[in-house]
C-alpha cells in the first residue's frame, strides 16, 4: 500500500472487546485486533494508509437460540448490558445492515478517517471514543517520594485533595 501511495485497511472486531461477555480469550483477541488497527493507523498515516475497525452486530448462528437469549438476559441482570444494549443484542439485524459501513470506510469518502473503532449494528452506527487516562493524581518524581498505598486508595476513592 505504501508503494501504491496509500490505501485502506478495514478490520473486523466485536463489541466483546469491551470484556463484558465472550469469556476471556475472545475479548482479548478482539482487543488485539483493535490495538493492531490503531497501531497501523498511527504508523502508516504519513504514507496515506488508513486503518479502521468495525465492530458489527449481525445475526449469526451464535447470536440466536435459547442459550444466547439466557446469556444476554443474565448480562443485563448483572449490570453488564443496559436495557437498550440488551434489546439490541436480542433483536440483531442481518449482516447486510453492517456491510455499508465497511464499504464506506474502505472508500475515498472516508479518506479523512483513520484509527477509528466503529460500531455498526442494524440501524445503529457509533464511534468508540479514544481511550485516554484520566488524571487522578500527580507529583514530580524528582522531588517527591512514590505514592503510598493509602494515598492511592484515597485517589481512587475520590477523596484525594
Locate predicted features.
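Short helix-to-coil "ATP-lid" hinge immediately C-terminal to the conserved N-box Asn in the Bergerat
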Residues: 2-3, 111
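Conserved beta-strand scaffold in the Rossmann-like NAD(H)/NADP(H)-binding core
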Residues: 53-55, 117
Amino acid at each position: 500500500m505504501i508503494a501504491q501511495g496509500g490505501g485502506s485497511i478495514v478490520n473486523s472486531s466485536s463489541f466483546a472487546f469491551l470484556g463484558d461477555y465472550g469469556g476471556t480469550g475472545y475479548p482479548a483477541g478482539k482487543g488485539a485486533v483493535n490495538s493492531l488497527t490503531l497501531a497501523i493507523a498511527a504508523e502508516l498515516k504519513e504514507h496515506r494508509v488508513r486503518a479502521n475497525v468495525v465492530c458489527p452486530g449481525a445475526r449469526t448462528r451464535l447470536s440466536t437460540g435459547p442459550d444466547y437469549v439466557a446469556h444476554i438476559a443474565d448480562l443485563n441482570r448483572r449490570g453488564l448490558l443496559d436495557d437498550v444494549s440488551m434489546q439490541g443484542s436480542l433483536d440483531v439485524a442481518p449482516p447486510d445492515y453492517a456491510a455499508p459501513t465497511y464499504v464506506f470506510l474502505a472508500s475515498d469518502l472516508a479518506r479523512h478517517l483513520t484509527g477509528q473503532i466503529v460500531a455498526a449494528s442494524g440501524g445503529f452506527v457509533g464511534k468508540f471514543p479514544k481511550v485516554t487516562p484520566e488524571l487522578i493524581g500527580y507529583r514530580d518524581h524528582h522531588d517527591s517520594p512514590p505514592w503510598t498505598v493509602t494515598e492511592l486508595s484515597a485517589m481512587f476513592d475520590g477523596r484525594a485533595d
